[in-house]
């Protein structure tokens, strides 16, 4: 194989096997996850202050490894004035400090601008970054940007820099809308994850689900899956959706919250701009594009639209806005719609980095950390290609505790040789003797002992012997 030119130096498996088995026995004790949610598209603004507009990126830390990391750092840090030392010196955290991680965060863009997330991040609590990203580059033709999240303990340890995927940059949407099909990837499809915002000169509010109640909030938001559904579909616990179809104005859609799985009633999505809401659009004619404004009309009452109560500035209730009666005729619009009836549609993406340090905190940053996206077996299942981002030559693949021959191709791809049946049998016996259930899980191990688990499993394929035909 050509990739053998970049074969990764094999890690001493005996040296790491016991530590790896300790991790496999209880991964939740060691895993540290970094969840980064951000918009897939940013909007370019041309004015005196050139900038990119996007909804708030969100950061959530999870996993028991963060508390373990904190205890290790607190015991090893020589600075008594460190924030970690100012916490309780008891080895057992009380209820108030149980979710504290003391990790500070900064968000950066590709042009180097840095803004600080105000408070230390706590477990399972999203920390929000800034809304506006200044782009001082003279090149107004920029097509994409990146977000870089830096996590660190003040004065103690630098966790690393975690990078988003590429964020498309689009110009401010024009009033006119192109007839389908659109040549770029800026159209919404059924099954996409989106956020919905109401923006005006005074405030920006986001559609949010909190404790089962639909509300508007700032800066927090909820993500929704937008589904294409049939107009005659009955509401129920299970809905029949049309996946991967392009969403066009005039179609019937259903919004389902991704966290609490709460769905709004069926609504018709309509074009909206400063001139009003278009009531005459036929489905299949105009695609719904990123960063365009839309209105959602309830099917049960054509005079009822999804909106927000405008009386509260920061936190508002979800309240359908009732218009005076109208007749839906060709070319008719609702003139001067209330601003809280029109929504800015922004595509959203969430990525999760996971790492573990069973041997204690690494001497340096845990990044670049691999982000696993897909895998593909080839050569009759003997090899597998793992695709993603953040791969380095320092990483070697393991299947449970079996070291795999690993070939580094580039930062987005590595190739691994899967173990033989004999190697699997020896590993299964070894793990079961240690009281560990084999999972055939693929993970990457850095040469200093940092583990990056994937969600990919490669169980042994059962071989069915063919019966001789008579």
Give short role names for the model-derived ranges.
Residues 11, 15, 54-56, 100-102, ...:
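Eukaryote-biased feature marking scaffold/signaling PDZ-domain proteins and nuclear chromatin regulators
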Residues 22-176, 414-416:
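Beta-strand-enriched, solvent-exposed domains that form extended recognition/catalytic surfaces
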Residues 1-7:
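Long, low-complexity intrinsically disordered regions in eukaryotic nuclear regulators
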Residues 180, 184-321, 326-328:
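Eukaryotic intrinsically disordered, low-complexity regulatory regions
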Residues 13, 19-55, 62-64, 178-209, ...:
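Beta-strand/beta-sandwich contexts
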Residues 7, 14, 173-176:
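Contiguous, amphipathic alpha-helical segments that mediate oligomerization or scaffolding
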Residues 3, 16-19, 71-74, 161, ...:
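Structured alpha-helical bundle/scaffold domains in large eukaryotic membrane-trafficking regulators
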Residues 151-152, 156-171, 259, 266-470:
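Ser/Thr/Pro-rich low-complexity tracts
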């Amino acid at each position: 194989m050509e990739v053998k030119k970049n074969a990764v130096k094999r890690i001493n498996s005996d040296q790491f096997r016991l530590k790896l088995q300790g991790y496999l026995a209880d991964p939740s004790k060691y895993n540290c996850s970094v969840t980064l949610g951000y918009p897939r598209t940013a909007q370019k603004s041309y004015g005196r202050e050139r900038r990119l507009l996007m909804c708030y990126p969100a950061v959530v830390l999870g996993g028991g490894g963060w508390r373990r990391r904190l205890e290790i750092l607190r015991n090893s840090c020589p600075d008594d004035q460190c924030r970690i030392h100012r916490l309780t010196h008891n080895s057992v955290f009380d209820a108030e400090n149980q979710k504290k991680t003391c990790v500070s965060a900064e968000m950066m863009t590709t042009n180097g601008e840095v803004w600080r997330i105000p408070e230390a991040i706590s477990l399972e609590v999203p920390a929000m970054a800034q809304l506006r990203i200044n782009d001082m580059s003279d090149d107004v033709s920029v097509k994409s940007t990146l977000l870089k999240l830096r996590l660190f303990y003040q004065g103690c340890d630098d966790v690393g820099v975690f990078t988003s995927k590429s964020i498309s940059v689009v110009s401010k949407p024009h009033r006119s809308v192109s007839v389908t099909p659109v040549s770029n990837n800026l159209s919404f499809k059924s099954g996409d994850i989106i956020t919905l915002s109401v923006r005006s000169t005074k405030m920006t509010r986001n559609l949010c689900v909190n404790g089962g109640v639909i509300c508007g909030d700032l800066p927090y938001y909820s993500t929704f899956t937008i589904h294409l559904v049939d107009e005659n579909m009955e509401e129920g616990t299970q809905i029949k959706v049309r996946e991967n179809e392009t969403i066009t104005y005039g179609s019937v859609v259903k919004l389902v919250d991704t966290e609490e799985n709460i769905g709004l009633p069926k609504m018709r999505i309509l074009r909206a701009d400063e001139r009003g809401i278009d009531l005459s659009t036929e489905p299949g004619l105009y695609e719904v594009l990123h960063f365009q404004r839309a209105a959602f009309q309830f099917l049960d009452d054509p005079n009822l639209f999804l909106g927000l109560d405008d009386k509260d500035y920061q936190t508002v209730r979800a309240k359908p806005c009732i218009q005076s009666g109208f007749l839906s005729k060709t070319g008719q619009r609702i003139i001067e719609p209330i601003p809280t009836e029109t929504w800015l549609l922004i595509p959203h993406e969430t990525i999760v980095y996971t790492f573990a340090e069973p041997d204690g905190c690494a001497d340096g940053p845990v990044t670049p950390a691999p982000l696993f996206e897909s895998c593909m077996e080839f050569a009759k299942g003997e090899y597998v290609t793992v695709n993603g981002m953040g791969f380095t030559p320092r990483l070697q693949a393991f299947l449970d505790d079996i070291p795999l021959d690993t070939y580094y191709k580039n930062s987005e791809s590595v190739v691994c040789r899967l173990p033989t049946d004999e190697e699997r049998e020896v590993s299964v016996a070894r793990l079961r003797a240690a009281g560990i259930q084999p999972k055939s899980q693929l993970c990457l191990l850095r040469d200093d002992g940092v583990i990056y688990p994937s969600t990919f499993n490669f169980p042994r394929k059962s071989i069915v012997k063919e019966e001789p035909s008579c």
